[in-house]
Amino acid sequence: MKRKEGKLKGYKGLNLYYQYWLPEGKPKAVLLVAHGLAEHSGRYKNLVDYFVPKGYAVYALDHRGHGKSEGTRSYVDNFNDYLTDLETFFGMVRKENKNARIFLFGHSLGGTIATAYAVEHQEGLAGLILSGSSLVPSTSVSPALLAMAGVVSALLPKMGVTLLDASAISRDKAVVDAYVNDPLVFRGKVPARTGAELARMWKHLPEQMHKIKLPILIMHGFADQLANPAGSKLLYERVSSKDKTLKLYDNCYHEICNEPEREQVFMDMQAWLAKHI
């Protein structure tokens, strides 16, 4: 396995960090990873260690305001900025892998980004894989908090409004401890503008889901308290894809790739990918 890293210019000239892992020989396909809110590309070691030895290349970008990329921590001025950055990153990955089949993998916020991206940019993608996507309001997010985020976003967009509950990411204590102690994970309050932009996507994305015609694998932990599983069910119902699969994992928390059942999750992903390459 070979690991490389680099930087690219994102929207408005922001320096964005990325890293990628290559198998020995020509890749079977490419997994392009869009990570979740407040985390970074380096937290996908389990996925990398499973898929790269099996012949897949994995490319992962740190979103603006995340990990080793520039920008105010966990802040986005407009959700479309994420999509523009991803389009730039996809172009780079495509250039380096001209004939490869590229699958977009999105987790949590990255699932929101991947879904929104697929609505407008299906060309060049072989398929979409989603994990714990944030597509509708979480049951832990009150209407009052959503309303407050919208008001504060207009006045003080970078003001922190809510903390993410680290204990809700996984039932594996080692995963939670590593998350809490990771210097590249943002442990402060999520900025109001970011919350408001995510809420905007929750409102408008359901109206656009029917535009997706790609092969799609939708996965979600049934006990996820950070991203509502109802969003994944809604996406499954509304996409126009004839080739669509929904996998719900009993007892699993938000990060199904970091849960005790992760081996089964990866086996399900691998079986799905094998049918699409």
Task: Kindly label every feature range from the protein language model.
Residues 1-25:
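N-terminal cap/lid segment of alpha/beta-hydrolase-fold proteins
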Residues 212, 218-220, 224:
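Short beta-strand/loop motif that positions the catalytic acidic residue
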Residues 245-277:
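Catalytic active-site module of serine/aspartate enzymes centered on a nucleophile-bearing elbow/loop
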Residues 214, 228-237:
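Short alpha-helix in the alpha/beta-hydrolase fold that links the catalytic acid
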Residues 38-41, 67-101:
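Catalytic nucleophile-loop/oxyanion-hole region of alpha/beta-hydrolase
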Residues 28-36:
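Short beta-strand element of the alpha/beta-hydrolase
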Residues 43, 48-71:
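Conserved alpha/beta-hydrolase
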Residues 107-190:
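Alpha/beta-hydrolase-fold enzymes
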